[in-house]
């Protein structure tokens, strides 16, 4: 099945999602009336300024927190109705995570960190470490297989994190500000790797960012402000549309500026 057909099938559905937190005698509304579909094989960027509700939404979508009301369905399964044990098993089998702070275990080598999700699935050590070595080679770290996180740069640690997230071929990979601690050159390298894995493995990726540059890597851009969706755009061919996206909330357009691509390759919304 090609990418266009894959992206006609929703893998994640959000229905009238609300998240509220009690603060003293008051209630803070962090998310309100969020409804959206994210398609299989799609790269979706949840974009907005600090405090807009991006990370809160990511926590709801990934089952790390339960909504106050509304539903999140992954593959048709309403994850907020699962018990904590069921939810833990579901995340291990169906979800992958890339973190801004890498979240590698310091006492494990690069190979062992990448192989960890397969260990939780009961894959024998020789097979899981072979799979880890293959993915580390793909992200350019064949020379770091036995290095510990403290012996690697931030960009190298994030590449280990990417390999770990994709090793189980999960239904969805969640990436929370995956380049927030990286310089611009390393950011490009890391995002190119994420897009390459997503394309080749037909994976769904949901990334959170406050940086408009990140939207240039997405098929689907969801703009948040004050806990609600204020803009949503879709396109089909991100490999031709690398550039700088700036969300114009009032006109609901996406503007791209990139001197390296002709105007015909730039998505301008509709």
Regions found by a protein language model. Give the residues of each.
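Short amphipathic beta-strand/extended segments with alternating polar/hydrophobic composition
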Residues: 81, 234-235
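ABC family nucleotide-binding domain
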Residues: 10-224
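ABC-family P-loop ATPase nucleotide-binding domain
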Residues: 1-20, 235-270
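Intrinsically disordered, low-complexity regions
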Residues: 4, 25, 76, 155, ...
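H-loop (His-switch) and adjacent beta-strand-loop-beta switch element
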Residues: 221-233
């Amino acid at each position: 099945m090609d990418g266009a057909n894959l992206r006609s099938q929703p893998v994640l559905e959000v229905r009238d999602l609300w998240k509220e937190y009690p603060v003293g005698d008051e209630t803070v509304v962090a998310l309100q009336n969020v409804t959206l579909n994210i398609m299989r094989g799609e790269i979706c960027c949840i974009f907005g300024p600090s405090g807009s509700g991006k990370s809160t939404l990511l926590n709801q979508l990934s089952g790390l927190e339960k909504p106050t009301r509304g539903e999140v369905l992954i593959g048709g399964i309403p994850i907020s109705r699962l018990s904590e044990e069921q939810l833990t098993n579901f995340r291990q089998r169906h979800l992958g995570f890339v973190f801004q702070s890498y979240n590698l275990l310091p006492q494990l080598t690069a190979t062992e960190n990448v192989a960890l999700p397969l260990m939780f699935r009961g894959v024998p050590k020789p097979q899981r470490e072979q799979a880890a070595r293959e993915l580390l080679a793909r992200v350019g770290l064949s020379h770091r297989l036995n290095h510990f996180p403290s012996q690697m740069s931030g960009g190298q640690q994030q590449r280990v994190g990417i390999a770990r997230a994709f090793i189980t071929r999960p239904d969805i990979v969640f990436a929370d500000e995956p380049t927030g601690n990286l310089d611009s050159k390393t950011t490009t390298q890391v995002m190119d790797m994420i897009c390459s894995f997503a394309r080749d493995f037909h994976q769904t990726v949901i990334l959170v960012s406050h940086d408009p540059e990140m939207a240039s890597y997405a098929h689907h851009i969801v703009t948040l402000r004050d806990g609600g969706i204020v803009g949503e755009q879709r396109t089909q061919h991100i490999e031709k549309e690398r550039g700088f996206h700036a969300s114009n909330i009032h006109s609901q357009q996406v503007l791209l500026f990139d001197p390296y691509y002709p105007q015909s390759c730039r998505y301008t919304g509709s």
